[in-house]
Amino acid sequence: MSSEEKLAAKVSTKASDVASDIGSFIRSQRETAHVSMRQLAERSGVSNPYLSQVERGLRKPSADVLSQIAKALRVSAEVLYVRAGILEPSETSQVRDAIITDTAITERQKQILLDIYASFTHQNEATREECPSDPTPTDD
């Protein structure tokens, strides 16, 4: 096997692993939301057979399809993009993860909360840089 064939096989295996991971994640989110596959297909505008193939890891959905599925499941499209390998994961934060995965709030509300949180963390970081001897930010 040539080096090009080995590389192609490795890329193909990685792509199928990603497809399987995103599929199982979508399935778990769907089951957590108590939504049938048919209901999710209907809500997201994706055919039932295609959604089934995605969940089983046989097809890797496009960013548009992931966005539609995310909206139908009321989860962040960013989470699905990262799982699918479309986006690189951003800085780890328990608060950020909690906001993104919360199904009780809308995508718009999630984005507003994330923006506010980012603003506070950047402000606190700037304060720490100005006063490195003070380990905790002040309450202004």
UniProtKB/Swiss-Prot annotation:
<feature type="DNA-binding region" description="H-T-H motif">
    <location>
        <begin position="37"/>
        <end position="56"/>
    </location>
</feature>
<keyword id="KW-0804">Transcription</keyword>
<dbReference type="InterPro" id="IPR001387">
    <property type="entry name" value="Cro/C1-type_HTH"/>
</dbReference>
<keyword id="KW-0238">DNA-binding</keyword>
<protein>
    <recommendedName>
        <fullName>Uncharacterized HTH-type transcriptional regulator Rv0474</fullName>
    </recommendedName>
</protein>
<dbReference type="InterPro" id="IPR010982">
    <property type="entry name" value="Lambda_DNA-bd_dom_sf"/>
</dbReference>
<keyword id="KW-0805">Transcription regulation</keyword>
<dbReference type="GO" id="GO:0009274">
    <property type="term" value="C:peptidoglycan-based cell wall"/>
</dbReference>
<feature type="domain" description="HTH cro/C1-type">
    <location>
        <begin position="26"/>
        <end position="80"/>
    </location>
</feature>
<dbReference type="InterPro" id="IPR050807">
    <property type="entry name" value="Bact_TransReg_Diox"/>
</dbReference>
<dbReference type="GO" id="GO:0003700">
    <property type="term" value="F:DNA-binding transcription factor activity"/>
</dbReference>
<dbReference type="Pfam" id="PF01381">
    <property type="entry name" value="HTH_3"/>
</dbReference>
<dbReference type="GO" id="GO:0003677">
    <property type="term" value="F:DNA binding"/>
</dbReference>
<dbReference type="GO" id="GO:0005829">
    <property type="term" value="C:cytosol"/>
</dbReference>
<dbReference type="GO" id="GO:0006355">
    <property type="term" value="P:regulation of DNA-templated transcription"/>
</dbReference>
